[in-house]
Amino acid sequence: MVIDRAEGTSSSDASGNPSAVSFSIPKSYFRLLEELDGQGFKDALRGETAYLLERTSYEHLKPYLAMIRRHPRNGTPRVQDAHFLMSFDREFQAIAFKYVGIFESQMRAQYAHRMTCSHGGLCLYDRGLFLREGNHARSLEHYSGEVERKARKGDPSVKRALAENGGRGPIELGIECMSLGTLSMLYSNTADRDVTDGVAESFGCTKSELASWLRTVGDARNAFAHFDSYLVRRQIPSTPLAIKGIGASNRKPFYIALLLMHLLSCDEMIEDWTLKYALLMNSEISGLLERNEGLFGYLYGEMGIPEENGRLDMIEAAGGRLVFAVAKGDAGESR
């Protein structure tokens, strides 16, 4: 079967002139193309649609197709728009994933430093430092497995540390081996309030807020790591505690961006812009939204993205605690 692009004009071709390029479509794709055509996608039988399906599975496209079918641009659903939406989602995830990494790095540094200073390098093996025995046992099992896996892969520093400590991994090394999920479990279960409050204060929040936000960031991170569909979900993977002073819905997928900007904001007056992570993220996300406003601005509300005139939420989340306080009319007090 040959589908000729000359059968129609691409919506991106402003001249209206058809292309002479033809695509040979494998028979195994006929059923999918016919199914999409039956669902009302105007460009379903075009060669570009089969080309896309050879590079992105139908299952992966489904959430984007469903969103475009429910809310077609210009009144007509197109596979091309689903592809554009998927690309927009991937770009958002790539930006968010980068800042998840920065948040993770600070979380690891803060927790390991405070636990080591207060309780020594082998503190994670001390049952008395944790609130719930069962949770500690599960966390320690995960931690030990992750450290041993790193040693088996040939990391000499981890191998040496295990040998010197009877098979136990000091937290200053082990913290870099553990998953964010394991770190989240350990932090939430840590009994020493000086440690947990100190870590939370470094992010400008309370222990209960940080424990909640850690779960949400971890769940979102797992989606980003595999480029699963994200912004087109009906709600965020796990609903976090709301950020005080931020009016956006904490159930919508986009809330993860506000959460990360809030966590990475800072009270301190820093001259080095490369360290102003929240403002950098705000700039990147704002740029992405502005570039795609013409295509998908009408869907932003579905995703929980503030309207252009309501983006103060993003500025407040990203601007740092001092900036937020100034915006509230009290320059001498941070939140």
Explain the meaning of each model-derived region.
Residues F227:
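Acidic/aromatic/glycine-rich contiguous surface patches that form carbohydrate-binding/processing clefts
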